[in-house]
Design a protein with these regions (language model features):
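Short amphipathic alpha-helical surface micro-motifs
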Residues: 16-19, 43-45, 96, 114, ...
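A glycine/threonine-rich phosphate-anchoring loop and its flanking beta-alpha core
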Residues: 11, 107-147
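A short, small-residue-rich loop immediately preceding and capping a beta-strand
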Residues: 82-119
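Short, glycine/charged-enriched secondary-structure capping and boundary segments
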Residues: 49-52, 78, 105-108, 128-131
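Short glycine/serine/threonine-rich phosphate/pyrophosphate-binding segments
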Residues: 20, 43-47, 72, 97-104, ...
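Fold-independent oxyanion-binding glycine-rich loops
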Residues: 17-18, 38-40, 93-95, 116-119, ...
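ATP/NTP phosphate-donor binding region
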Residues: 1-89
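Short, surface-exposed, polar/charged, turn-prone segments marking secondary-structure boundaries
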Residues: 41-42, 62-66, 90-92, 118-121, ...
Length: 147
């Protein structure tokens, strides 16, 4: 029997020393109104470099420190922020839960998503799903993405 293997990969992958200083240049085609969903440590690590990459632009940037769990309530909160502020790109900055929250938010709002992993061990940037929890932190579901 023939065994097939499939790999899904991001449309674009950028890596290198101080690559965040090139964030805007590399991602500008996606939009001009950005929601950054960040873990606390991800925000501290990435914020200044990302902001430097936007120097001289008029792009809107909104940073949100998320609640720590990719819960239904947290995702809905981020979706409301997107809608209220007419944002058109979602960025996840941090570990797995921040990234899963960003992927789910972008999916439901039909927006592009950018992943900035700050934890080496997370597989959230590479998987076509998000793990969703209830607001009491019990497991809810897996959200599988079509592409």
């Amino acid at each position: 029997m023939l065994r097939l293997r499939m790999m899904r990969a991001p449309q674009k992958y950028v890596q290198g020393k101080d690559s965040l200083l090139q964030f805007h240049k590399e991602m500008t085609s996606l939009g001009d109104k950005w929601l950054f969903i960040c873990s606390r440590s991800g925000y501290k690590m990435a914020h200044d470099k990302i902001e430097k990459s936007f120097e001289g632009t008029s792009d809107v940037r909104q940073y949100e420190i998320f609640g720590g769990v990719s819960s239904t309530g947290e995702i809905e909160k981020m979706r409301e922020i997107v809608r209220e502020n007419h944002l058109n790109v979602v960025v996840g900055v941090g570990g797995g839960s921040a990234i899963d929250t960003a992927k789910a938010t972008a999916h439901y709002e039909k927006l592009p998503v950018v992943i900035v992993p700050t934890v080496v061990a997370t597989d959230a940037p590479c998987t076509g799903l998000s793990v969703i929890y209830n607001d009491d932190e019990t497991f809810n579901s897996y959200l599988f993405y079509p592409k």
